């Protein structure tokens, strides 16, 4: 990630809506977002499980101020017809954004764990460095959620029943699932106060990515 800010979103999609949802994401929604001032890139992941269609979206932002900036709020208050059809159908919707407080490693892993945490580590940089030192881990990022900036009432927010809240994001990017499991075990050993209150450690695989530098603005 290049920017100081982030926006993280989890949601579930029913099987009969899956094609429409994927087309909406890749053919309209992520393009709309990354052409909004302050958005740098979008990455879409799908959970590695067969019982549910669960997705994780990570947006890279120039700064956390983008979250309640005029450009993004204008988008949120003018959802497209396609967005109006899709958004009310999303289940277990969780959304939050803020500032990245620690990064370690380089590049992006095709396989990730994106954990919601309820307590930030006392020293985020030290935890990030310890986890990225694990075999097969490419990068680790830790973010702090800004509840005020992500709680502004908007038209889109009104289409969803609930967005939940989480204090922070722990993103571990690996070369394979075994690498992620090793890093998870390490995190539990050195930061039990953080991991004891983290969300389920699901594995996600990369599905789609779009960078504002290469998007078709025409």
Q: PLM features: what roles do these ranges have?
A:
Residues 1-218:
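Macromolecular interaction modules
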């Amino acid at each position: 990630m290049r920017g100081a800010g982030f926006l993280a979103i989890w949601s579930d999609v029913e099987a009969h809506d899956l094609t429409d949802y994927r087309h909406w994401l890749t053919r309209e929604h992520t393009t709309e977002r990354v052409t909004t001032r302050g958005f740098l890139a979008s990455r879409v992941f799908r959970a590695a499980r067969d019982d549910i269609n669960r997705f994780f979206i990570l947006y890279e932002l120039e700064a956390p101020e983008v979250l309640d900036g005029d450009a993004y709020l204008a988008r949120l208050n003018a959802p497209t017809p396609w967005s109006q059809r899709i958004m009310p159908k999303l289940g277990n919707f969780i959304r939050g954004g803020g500032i990245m407080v620690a990064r370690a490693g380089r590049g992006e892993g095709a396989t990730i764990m994106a954990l919601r945490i309820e307590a930030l580590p006392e020293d985020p940089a030290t935890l990030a460095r310890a986890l990225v030192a694990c075999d097969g881990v490419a990068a680790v990022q830790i973010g702090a959620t800004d509840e005020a900036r992500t709680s502004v009432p908007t038209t889109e927010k009104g289409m969803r029943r609930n967005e939940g809240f989480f204090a922070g994001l722990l993103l571990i990017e690996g070369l394979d699932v075994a690498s992620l499991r090793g890093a998870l075990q390490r995190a539990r050993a050195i930061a039990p106060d953080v991991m004891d209150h983290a969300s389920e450690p699901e594995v996600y695989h990369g599905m789609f990515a779009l960078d504002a530098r290469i998007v078709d603005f025409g």
